Amino acid sequence: MSHQALGIDLSKVERLSVPNILHFVWIGDLNEVNTHYIDIWEKTNKDKQIFFWYDQNSSLCHLLNNAIRDFVSVKKIKNKVKAELKIKNHAFKYIYPKIKTGFSFDELVIEFLTKHEIPYQRPPKAIEDAWFGNRGFIKKSITELFCNDFDDFMRYYYYEIILRHNIASASDIVRLLIIYQYGGTYIDVDTLPYIDNIYHKLNEYIRKEGIVESDSFLLFKTVCFLKKINSEGGLPEAVIGCDENELGLDAVGFEEIKRLIELDLTDFSLDMILPLGETYVHKNLLALGSLRRFKGVYFNNFISSHQKSKAVRIILRVMKKRYRFLERKNCIFDCYIDDGSRCYLTRRS
């Protein structure tokens, strides 16, 4: 097969085995993480090691952001957005240099808030190492990723955590560093394994009737699965109470679908979920998550590759280049406003 975008004939590219490691990342308070999905991955992929990446000293990133935002919101200030950005700039310039010398982020957060008389909620309780051992996870420190050639990425990581409180972007940095340095498969903590194969009777009915599965329909199938394994805690009532109108069905069709789902799930066990098995990628490339119905659309909630992949290295290099561009244009600490073609430079708080 020839890949036109890359100009590569993939049939001639060597395929390499991916290390048997599943990587999960959590940034923030570990008390808030829901491990239900990770547990499912672990139980259905017993040949894989579970690496749980966690920044032990950054559990107060949410506390810092919320404290500053609440502090500004009660002040009689005309431009609250600008005031919030200014305090966050001070926070970064106070916290980050000290982190570089070995101080704890969490301790510096409390120190900064106290020094500036910014009220904050009680910090969450500390997590013991037993938390990881009891779940069979191998504890890995995010900070170890910022060594040698990757020390600049530590600065970018804290830009996202302190200045923008953009945990998703911080996680993007971390997941790429993990895959490049370790290889294996990165998975978002809110991503399930492929489960559609367990719906034998339902899927046969869908094909027969020519039903197009909407996002609501797919979500309904997932909710039913989660209810079956008693992991539905916290799901919104609107999802659990889904009706035929949301699925684009009439009442009769909806009842039939519920009946078939019940039949499919009657004898369900986790053994029915297909394991990843041995995973291969083309040399120096990577595999990404995708949905069958979205041709050419890929997602970074699932990334798999071997160590030192050139493709991942290129992505990291481009990321570094863009952060440096923003630094040169003074767009890290300033609120850049431009309604023209360069509006992507605008800092988002």
What are these regions (language model features)?
Residues 1-172, 187-349:
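Glycosyltransferase-associated regions of secretory-pathway enzymes
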Residues 172-184:
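Small-residue hinge/turn detector
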